[in-house]
Amino acid sequence: MSVYQTREGLPSGWVAQWDAEYGTYFYVNESAQNPQPQWEPPVENLKLAPPPGATSVNTAVYNNNNNTSAANTNAAYNANTAANANANTATTTNAAATTSAAYNPNAPANTNAAYYPNAAATTTTNADGSDKGLFSGLTSSNGYTTGNSYSRPSYVAPVAAGLGGLALGGLASHALGNLFHHRGHNGGGFGGFGGGSGGPPPGPGGFGGFGGFGGEGHHHGGHGGFGGGPGGFEGGPGGFGGGPGGFGGGLGGFGGGPGGFGGGPGGHGGPGW
């Protein structure tokens, strides 16, 4: 199966491959010892034009919105133009009687040339003379079709991400709980730090994992987790509070991990005795 790839605007050794299902590119560092595909471009704010005949997801949304706006705008414009046709004709007739020569005797016959002397050199047209249109601001892909393709990047499912963070939190809580217990019986362990990453852009990603649970201590409960891992739209929640202690519960979690649109909530404090 042939795929579309390009190296336009990428560092040496990198290649971008078009994913027709998601309507976007993913990127591979072919110079790495173990090349791994990724959705994030290696260059910040890189904008590649889609392959010929293809449409990106964001562009499709843009076109639909603007087609609707254009239809409404043109209808209103045409109605106003028809209503004012006579007035415009009268104004144009009077304007023709007053020539520009009275103000600028040396004005060229083609006034556009005076204001836009380099218009011909800067016109954004294709080889056939047609306007480049919507993608004129994007980097030309200058790509090629090849049979040497890569598989799209995989990502951790949301449920698996949450369970993974919770498991990591439990392990960290147990290990650090033993450490603090042997240093003066002052508390249980800390929660976990883990969580899954988001899915491919521009769609939603997975949710971050949970922070760990705090352990029990002799004089003070353990602290809650330090938050879940990052997610596409929301980080995982913080730990669920410290375990009970001799003289007071541990602190709650210190906040969820970062997300595309907001971190998760913090944890809740444990009970005191």
Swiss-Prot record:
Biased composition (Gly residues): 205-215, 223-273
Parts forming coiled coils: none
Annotated Gene Ontology cellular component terms: nucleus
All copies of domain WW, residue ranges: 8-44
CDD domains reported for this sequence: WW
Stored Pfam families: WW
Region of interest (Disordered), residue spans: 191-273
Top-level taxon: Eukaryota
InterPro entries (alphabetical): WW_dom, WW_dom_sf
Name this protein carries in UniProt: WW domain-containing protein C660.06
Organism, as annotated: Schizosaccharomyces pombe (strain 972 / ATCC 24843)
